[in-house]
């Protein structure tokens, strides 16, 4: 089940291809515009990646437990969103989808779920993620304004507990929420999400 609130031109084949890619620092693709309506191929420089590595280097990776690792994953995703947003013009991506679909550089939950999965795969390839497996995206039948909602998912390798990793609830560059998947599936929504803010509260006001 796929929802396409931002653009009617989303390409399901692109969504599948990008989700199934084997990303590397020298070549990977990201989505935006709603359901991968826009796709960018890019690479990360050594300076870019060092910003992510520094997040994990500031902790003793050998003593990190699954809970601590989830906190680091969230910080790593936030850093990658910031870096990539500057490269492809999504720095002004706002939380949610409902009020900002007319603005440039916006992501729906499908874009967020796919990109977040890609970012976590890059971190796992680098050896930063040791306590979790990266799973397929999931969709829940809890509707926001008539639309289903998707998320990236990880699984704790020790306990087998699944966690939703949801970047959609906050603006670009903010850490995603990471909550038990069962809680997310039941309709979890963080109390501090700005997704219901009025249009005049957006940090980007010019339409394109």
Where are these regions (language model features)?
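Boundary at the C-terminal end of the N-terminal hydrophobic targeting segment
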Residues: 8-10
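Bacterial N-terminal signal peptides
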Residues: 1-5
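Hydrophobic/aromatic-rich core segments of domains that either
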Residues: 121-182
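Mid-length scaffold segments of soluble, non-membrane domains
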Residues: 70-132
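His-Asp-centered catalytic microenvironments across diverse enzyme cores
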Residues: 163-208
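Anionic, Ser/Thr-rich low-complexity intrinsically disordered regions
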Residues: 14-17
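Acidic/histidine-rich, surface-exposed loop or edge segments in extracytoplasmic proteins
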Residues: 31-67, 90-102
